[in-house]
Curated annotation (Swiss-Prot):
PROSITE patterns from the UniProt entry: EF_HAND_1, EF_HAND_2, EH
UniProt cross-references to InterPro entries, sorted A to Z: EF-hand-dom_pair, EF_Hand_1_Ca_BS, EF_hand_dom, EH_dom
Protein name: Actin cytoskeleton-regulatory complex protein PAN1
Limits of the EF-hand domain: 232-267, 527-562
């Protein structure tokens, strides 16, 4: 039957106040190490009735049983009290009791009592509280008059033989059976503050049920199976796992598992998952994990002792003493047979039935009026004494007090003849009804019920009995529960409060409180000095004089504990020791132990010095035969190695496949990039292949006639001027109307507003003036002026002005509408004619100038535009070059008329031509400025006077005839590949021709340049005439050809040495200096000079003209010291020429021509080479021409005469020329023919006379001393008119070659820079 009393809360034992009854308490439990024999007096005087029941509340609690050591049976007193009460409830009248002997307290219970006894129930004699009818208050309880009956004890020598132990169906619930919980797992008893005690116990039980035996961690799969039942999202569980797995080991220890469960519960309650754990929680979990790790390491170091079947009986109880033999240990917790219990009850109640007859029966065992007893354990009912009545040999012998339930250090041996109390059994319920006085008491069902895991609905099961086989009563369970109950820890609420107090006083945030501050805080509690010193000694664990946060919290906990009346412990329990101190002490112990273990003596021979001992002929048994375990381990290791190898191989394959994929991707990207680049190049080629707009008709729309386009452009250009005139007329009209309005309305106030409006300030000032005038008139006696309607007049005046302004605004709006309408019409017409509108400006600027595009696209657009300009210029100059080749005379005439036809902006008829002209001029100016800065060479423009030299009538026929002969000779003698550069050379446009009369469109800078150039020309002409006069005098006085050597400030390879005897290496040395970069600028300018007679060319090799080449010995001395010195100065850059003077070059031309006339051919070496074809002879040129030209404008010298019988060497290819500053016509790009020489001698190398180059450096005569005025050519010329001729050693180009004009070339746009033509092959 289910016991209704087992669910009642335990009532405080109120019957412990023995002072009122002069009764001594029963000494029970473990608490007494020695028991004193105290004489009992309380049982001689008994109180009757219920007169002392009101004082029951003052009775103190009796320490009974083992209730202070076990937690597994907390409710057993309540369960046992009602069970045994009905048995003692049968009270008999004590009317016939004759002996009233004082009962003496009996010492029951022995050291051999096992913990498996009745807890808190002293099974001793039962004092009865009776009342007498006569009013007397005496007690006759347990004073039997008959013989004592044998008591049921635990001796083997029972009078009645004991039955063997049998399984008894007692109704106990097997709650402690093994349900899969791993109780062997050792988890330190550390309290986690962030979860409650109940949650920690639940999590620990769940952890033990899941953990694998032999391990202290749960795997990720096991944890996942638990956490997924919460219903959270996978990403939330993943984040919880990341926070919980503090060691990143992939497994969870118990504190980490508890943390994970705490986070899951927090999320389920609506909280969010923290991004990172707070420091407090992290520290607690970390310290718990460290404690587990240290405990595991300590347990592994402790040597395991062999286990015995009796270990579980003594686990956790250190006070167990060896038991005396001869006694049967009480194994049954209240499982005696009911028959024996009934017999014992009958035997115990026999003396009570022989009591006094006059005693009135008292109801005992009830709840309503429980009599006062001196041995009461509860406030509910009297406790029966099952075996506490010691049988005596004589009736009058007092009973001795018995100690029950304790293990005493001194064994109290009872008097001889006494039977020791061994049965602390729980009595079975009486199945019979109570006799008297307890009719209202019902029989209670017995059965021990564990209070912790009781399930009321579970079926009753039979319990195992016997010695040491019932795991329900194992001491391990009892001890672990007892320890858990005794553990005292600081609650999280206390910790948080104490930590806040600590942080409040720790103003410096050092983590420590000094002794003065901490003691002052503790002193506020009001405790005495001794308690405070005790608390300080307990909390200052490391004896540092300061307290950290954990030590301060411990001290505050001890302070509050002492204030609550508890006793301070002498030493801290493990649960109160701060975790930091525990970890520090553990580390210290491990270090100490590690030092002792590391001091092992090394073996005599280690593995490195091992040598096989061949004396051992017989192998050891271990090597001959392997055990099964070793083979399994080897196989497992092999399997692990194979698995690792497989994993490595798989990873390698994955890496190889990944690398292959990356390579394929890179190759694919490269191929795609290559395809994109090819497509881009194709687009570029397609764009470049598009026809240029300049090659088309001047108009984008061929259907529109040219005259209509010109008319439209003219009208469009007149529109802005017309609107400007309209605006001016409108302004004049408004001003006239305002003036007329002022004349009509004669108002005395002059307005200061717009259009002379009268403002309020004007009226105010006028009113003040009128007031002053009126005052003056009053003083002088004059009549005051009448200005009453001043405001009305001002308003009328302003209205007239406003009317004029409104009319003007209407007119302006009408004009604006007309302008907008005209612009719309002109835009549509312009779109039809030119293919674009002004609104396309931004887009055109973007794609024409590359604005807002990528750098690559912008560079391509710029390069394409440059190439398009080059193609356009080539296209425009094609017709002009053809015209030059047709007729030289017509070309000259056209060239003569060109400045007159193309000299101004207005001479162009179409807008395209005018825009091309403007662009051409702008490009020329830009190139000139860039050339002045040294950024880029000029492509064809120079900065001398734009006026071409005017030739006399006598020079024109001769020059024309010479040009025709040179062209014919060039066409006959030159190979085809030499004729290729002739067209671009002849097609060089005369870009400077329109510059003579472009004053209308040039700015002030161009005007200043032209003025400077004119002054420069005048100075040069003056100097040139003076020097020519001096040179003519020198030529007349010169006696030898060597004296006419030209010292022009440059290299002397133009100079003609005197005839010398040829040597064998002259023909080879002739081409020695042709690739010298320092001489190309002058070597390319050699042209035939004109003389008085037919000149004879010298066959001296060119090696003689090289200053670095040793001069061949000659018959007459041809070395000129001054010329050599001047040459060296030129090479070193020390000459005085600044490259501006034009007369120097002219002088050089004249002197070279005279020198070429005077030089005669000398002997040549006999080793001649193959002859070359002979060119036709050229006509002789009279000397008067040279004389006139030397004084007048310089011209190109005539070619020398050659003999008909001499063989000619093929002339070098013509070099491209360009227009220089002093030339008005393009130069002739042909070289003069070489003179014929005899077939028996080596052909002489022709020495070409220098071409006419205006602006070259001045030349001096051979023996002429440099004068001071020679260095005065350096003029202060701005950089914008600087020339490139200062670069004396640059690679010669087309702009460095200049000849006299031979014909007129029609003007054309400037050509791009012509590439440098390679020099001719060496002479044979």
């Amino acid at each position: 039957m289910y016991n209704q009393y087992q669910q009642q809360p335990q009532q405080p034992q109120q019957f412990g106040g023995q002072q009122q009854f002069n009764a001594q308490p029963q000494s029970t439990g473990y608490g007494n190490f020695y028991q004193q024999q105290v004489p009992t007096q309380g049982q001689q005087q008994q109180f009757s009735g219920f007169q002392t029941f009101s004082n029951a509340g003052a009775l103190n609690q009796q320490p009974t049983g083992f209730s202070q050591q076990t937690q597994a049976q907390p409710q057993q007193p309540q369960q046992q009290q009602p069970q045994s009460q009905p048995q003692q409830g049968m009270q008999q009248p004590f009317g016939n009791q004759q002996q009233q002997m004082p009962l003496t307290q009996q010492l029951t219970g022995f050291n051999s009592m096992m913990p498996q006894t009745s807890f808190g129930q002293p099974q001793q004699q039962m004092p009865m509280n009776t009342s007498f009818n006569q009013g007397m208050s005496t007690t006759a309880v347990n004073a039997p008059t008959g013989p004592l009956q044998p008591q049921q004890t635990g001796f083997y020598s029972q009078q009645q033989p004991l039955e063997p132990l049998k399984p008894t169906a007692t109704g106990f619930i097997n709650s402690f059976a093994n349900t899969g919980v791993d109780n062997t797992l050792k988890i330190p008893a550390i309290r986690l503050s962030f979860i409650t005690t109940q949650d920690q116990a639940k999590f620990e039980k769940l952890f033990r049920s899941v953990v694998t035996p032999g391990s202290n961690t749960i795997t990720g799969d096991q944890c996942r199976n638990i956490l997924v039942k919460s219903g959270l999202q996978p990403h939330q569980l993943a984040k919880i796992w990341t926070l919980s797995d503090t060691n990143k080991a992939g497994v969870l220890l118990f504190p980490e598992f508890a943390l994970a469960m705490y986070l899951v519960n927090s999320v389920l309650q609506g909280d969010s998952i923290p991004y990172e754990l707070d420091s407090r929680t992290k520290a607690e979990v970390s310290s718990f994990v460290d404690a587990i790790n240290f405990s595991v390491s300590n347990d592994s170091e402790v040597e395991q002792k062999p286990k015995t079947p009796f270990d579980d009986l003594t686990a956790g109880i250190s006070m167990m003493q060896p038991q005396p033999t001869g006694y049967m240990p009480q194994l049954s917790f209240g499982s005696q047979p009911q028959q024996m219990q009934q017999q014992q009850q009958q035997q115990q109640q026999q003396p009570q039935q022989q009591s006094f007859q006059g005693l009135t029966q008292q109801p005992t065992g009830g709840y309503g009026a429980a009599p006062q007893t001196s041995f009461g354990n509860t406030s509910q009912a009297l406790q029966p004494q099952s075996t506490g009545f010691m049988p005596q040999n004589s009736f009058n012998q007092p009973l001795n007090a018995q100690t029950t339930g304790g293990f005493s250090s001194v064994l109290n041996i009872p008097p001889p003849g006494s039977m020791p109390q061994t049965s602390f059994t729980q009595q079975a319920p009486m199945q019979t009804s109570l006799a008297t006085g307890g009719g209202f008491l019902q029989p209670q069902a017995t059965g021990y019920l564990p209070p912790s895991n009781f399930q009321a609905t579970a079926p009753l099961q039979a319990q195992k009995t016997g010695f040491g086989n019932n795991d329900l009563y194992t001491s391990a369970n009892l001890a672990s529960k007892f320890i858990a109950r005794k553990e005292e820890a600081i609650t999280p609420e206390e910790k948080s409060l104490f930590y806040k107090i600590f942080e409040t006083y720790d103003v410096e945030k050092t983590g420590n409180l000094d002794s003065a501050t901490a003691v002052e805080i503790f002193r506020k509690s009001g405790l005495n000095r001794s308690d405070l010193e005790h608390i300080w000694n307990l909390c200052d664990t490391n004896n540092s004089g300061n307290l950290n946060k954990q030590e301060f919290a411990l001290g505050m906990h001890l302070v509050y504990r002492r204030l609550n009346g508890e006793v301070l412990p002498n030493t801290l329990p493990p649960s109160l020791i701060p975790s930091s101190t525990k970890i520090l002490n553990t580390v210290k112990d491990q270090l100490k132990q590690g030092v002792d273990k590391n001091n092992r003596q090394p073996t005599k021979e280690d593995g490195l010095r091992f040598r096989n001992n061949d004396d051992e002929l017989l192998p050891s048994s271990r090597n001959r035969r392997k055990t099964i375990d070793q083979s399994k381990k080897v196989n497992e290791n092999k399997e692990k190695i194979e698995n690792l190898k497989n994993l490595i191989r798989e990873k390698k394959e994955l890496l190889a496949s990944e690398k292959l994929r990356l390579e394929n991707d890179s190759q694919r990207k490269q191929s795609e990039n290559a395809d994109l680049l090819r497509s881009i190049e194709n687009l570029k080629s397609q764009i470049q292949a598009l026809p240029s707009t300049s090659k088309k008709s001047p108009s984008a729309n061929n259907a529109v006639p040219h005259d209509l386009q010109s008319r439209f452009d003219t009208l469009t250009a007149r529109i802005p001027n017309l609107f400007k005139e309209i605006s001016d007329v409108s302004k004049e009209l408004v001003s006239s109307q305002l003036a007329l309005h002022h004349l009509k309305v004669d108002h005395p106030i002059r307005g200061s507003g717009p259009n002379c409006k009268i403002t309020e300030l004007d009226c105010k000032n006028a009113r003040q003036r009128l007031t002053l005038t009126a005052g003056m008139c009053t003083l002088v006696g004059r009549p005051e002026p009448n200005y009453d309607n001043l405001e009305a007049q001002a308003q009328h005046f302003n209205e007239g002005i406003e009317t004029i302004e409104k009319d003007d605004q209407k007119n302006q709006s009408a004009i604006n509408n007309i302008s907008t309408w005209i612009q719309e019409i002109s835009s549509s017409v312009q779109a039809i004619i030119h293919g674009r509108t002004p609104s396309m400006g931004l887009e055109m600027d973007k794609w024409e100038s590359g604005i807002g595009l990528e750098p690559e696209v912008r560079d391509f657009i710029i390069s394409w535009k440059n190439r398009r300009n080059f193609d356009n210029s080539s296209y425009n100059t094609a017709g002009y070059s053809n015209g030059i080749q047709i007729s030289s005379s017509a070309t000259y005439r056209n060239n003569a008329r060109a400045p007159e036809e193309k000299d101004s902006y207005s001479s162009f008829q179409t807008p395209e031509e005018r825009s091309a002209y403007v662009k051409e001029q702008a490009k020329k100016k830009m190139e000139e400025k860039l050339a002045a800065l040294g950024i880029k060479k000029k492509s064809g423009s120079s900065q001398s006077s734009p006026n071409p030299p005017q030739l006399t009538q006598q020079q024109q026929p001769q020059q024309q005839q010479q040009q025709q002969q040179q062209q014919q000779q060039q066409q006959q003698q030159q190979p085809n590949y030499y004729q290729q550069p002739s067209q671009p050379a002849a097609a060089v446009n005369n870009s400077n021709l329109p510059k003579a009369n472009d004053d209308d469109d040039e700015d002030e800078e161009d005007e200043e340049e032209r003025r400077l150039l004119e002054q420069l020309e005048k100075l040069k002409l003056k100097k040139k005439q003076e020097k020519e006069a001096r040179l003519a005098a020198k030529r007349q006085t010169s006696s030898s050809p060597a004296e006419t050597k030209n010292d022009n400030g440059h290299d002397s390879w133009d100079d003609e040495p005197t005839p010398t005897n040829p040597t064998g290496n002259q023909s080879q040395a002739g081409s020695h200096h042709q690739y010298n970069p320092f001489g190309k600028s002058e070597a390319t300018q050699q042209k035939p000079a004109s003389g008085a007679g037919t000149p004879q060319l010298n066959n001296t090799p060119t090696g003689g003209r090289n200053p670095f080449f040793k001069q061949a010995p000659s018959q007459s001395s041809s070395f000129d010291l001054k010329a050599a010195e001047q040459q060296r100065r030129v090479q070193r850059g020390l000459d005085d020429s600044d490259g501006w003077s034009d007369d120097d070059e002219t002088e050089k031309v004249n002197t070279t021509a005279n020198k070429a006339v005077d030089v005669s051919s000398t002997a040549v070496p006999a080793t001649s080479t193959a002859s070359v074809p002979v060119a036709p002879s050229l006509p002789q040129i009279s000397a008067t021409t040279q004389e006139q030209s030397s004084v007048a404008v310089p011209i190109a010298p005539p070619l020398p005469l050659v003999k008909s019988e001499s063989s000619l060497i093929p002339p070098p290819p013509p070099l491209p020329t360009s227009i220089t500053e002093g030339s008005g016509a393009p130069p002739v790009p042909i070289a003069p023919p070489l003179p014929q020489i005899n077939s028996d001698v080596a052909p002489a190398v022709p020495v070409a006379a220098p071409l006419l180059k205006v602006g070259g450096t001045a030349t001096l005569a051979e023996n002429e001393e440099p004068k001071p005025d020679d260095a005065s050519d350096v003029l202060s010329i701005p950089e914008s008119v600087a020339s490139d001729e200062e670069d004396k050693f640059h690679t010669p180009g087309a702009e460095d070659v200049s000849v006299a004009p031979t014909g007129a070339i029609p003007p054309a746009p400037p050509a791009p820079p012509v590439p440098v033509i390679p020099p001719p092959p060496p002479m044979p």
